[in-house]
């Protein structure tokens, strides 16, 4: 049996743990479902004014914003200035064509009537999507996007401040974990 001091054991263990938390996922193996804290998603955003800007602000500290697209560059100038390294586009199709291989997901906050097609195009490329409400305008569009999500394996979410808020997620976790007991009524 090795004669190691408690202090040396704790010091070595702490160093090993620190190494694991900063090791890239290629070393740890993403195939096992592990994503290293140093890994960031490369995100593109289509429609970056108003809610689009708010959505980008929610992830700008944790993810890489690599491409921005808006038809109104005068209105979008402030957001473009905030992310000088991000490539800028007028047309989302050109952005998808040029950046498709280097983005993991897309934030969509364009005019409502364009949500479904921009989302479908991203999903077809295998990109995860966060889209502002409404995601679609018809049952047909909803069914199409459901089939696309199933066939491509991408994750999609329709944004809604009330349902996408961090506080809402926290309360759901409390309920699911039984931390606040059985919920029988909510007013």
Task: Give the residues covered by each predicted segment.
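Beta-strand-loop-alpha-helix segment that lines the small-molecule cofactor/substrate pocket
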Residues: 111-112, 116-164, 178
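Short acidic-hydrophobic, aromatic-tinged amphipathic segments that line or gate anion-handling sites
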Residues: 87-91
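N-terminal Rossmann-like dinucleotide-binding module
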Residues: 13-83, 162-165
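NAD(P)-dependent dehydrogenases' Rossmann-like dinucleotide-binding region
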Residues: 47, 179-187
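Local beta-strand N-terminus motif with an aromatic residue
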Residues: 65, 85, 103, 180-183
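N-terminal Rossmann-like NAD(P) cofactor-binding module of classical short-chain dehydrogenase/reductase
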Residues: 106-107
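Short amphipathic alpha-helix with an adjacent loop that forms part of the alpha/beta core around
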Residues: 94-101
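N-terminal secretory signal peptides and thylakoid transit peptides that target proteins
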Residues: 1-17
């Amino acid at each position: 049996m090795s004669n190691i001091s408690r202090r040396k054991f704790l010091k070595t263990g702490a160093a090993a743990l620190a190494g694991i938390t900063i090791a890239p996922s290629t070393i740890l193996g993403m195939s096992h479902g592990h994503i290293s804290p140093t890994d960031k998603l490369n995100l593109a955003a289509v429609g970056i004014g108003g809610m689009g800007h708010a959505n980008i602000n929610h992830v700008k500290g944790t993810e890489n914003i690599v491409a921005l697209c808006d038809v109104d560059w005068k209105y979008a100038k402030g957001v473009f200035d905030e992310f000088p390294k991000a490539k800028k586009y007028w047309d989302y199709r050109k952005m998808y064509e040029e950046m498709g291989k280097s983005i993991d997901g897309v934030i969509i906050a364009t005019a409502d009537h364009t949500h479904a097609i921009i989302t479908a195009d991203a999903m077809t490329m295998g990109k995860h999507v966060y889209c502002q409400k409404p995601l679609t305008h018809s049952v047909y569009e909803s069914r199409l996007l459901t089939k696309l999500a199933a066939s491509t394996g991408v994750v999609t979410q329709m944004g809604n401040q009330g349902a996408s808020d961090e506080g809402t997620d926290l309360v759901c976790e409390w309920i699911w974990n039984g931390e606040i007991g059985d919920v029988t009524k909510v007013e």
